[in-house]
């Protein structure tokens, strides 16, 4: 399937939710089919992180060597393992031109926003060594979310301490775990979110 055939602006949101709702077997099959189209590489990387199977981790490290996919692959790796690339000193300096994006120059033809803006540049060598030491903690065929299972407790922790895209996934997981749950409003003012989180215990 070519994801470009799905109309924007809901394409990426629909894809993420699809990956969250699919079981492991169906998700692997879907991603394998997705991999047949080179233009789907970014979807494939993000999907691997959401599916959460640690069998994807070595492949994600390979994607970190490509400047075009490095940061997204790092985010996907963190999504599975829970490894904070910044606090664990697993990031590197951006390559020359790696942070290229829109400028203030009216003559600059590059007007597209960098979809990975704000994500750290992962160091594949350090991360590979980390995986050699810690890989035995993860069981292939199991869905992981930030280093643990997809549980209510883990999702609440992600809502409290996670990055924004992790928090969005956690909010959706809570609804999937407990059908009928009102979707946590991650866009609400901070004080309101804190009040909602306090009521979830």
PLM features per residue range, with description:
Residues 1-201:
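Long, helix-rich interaction regions
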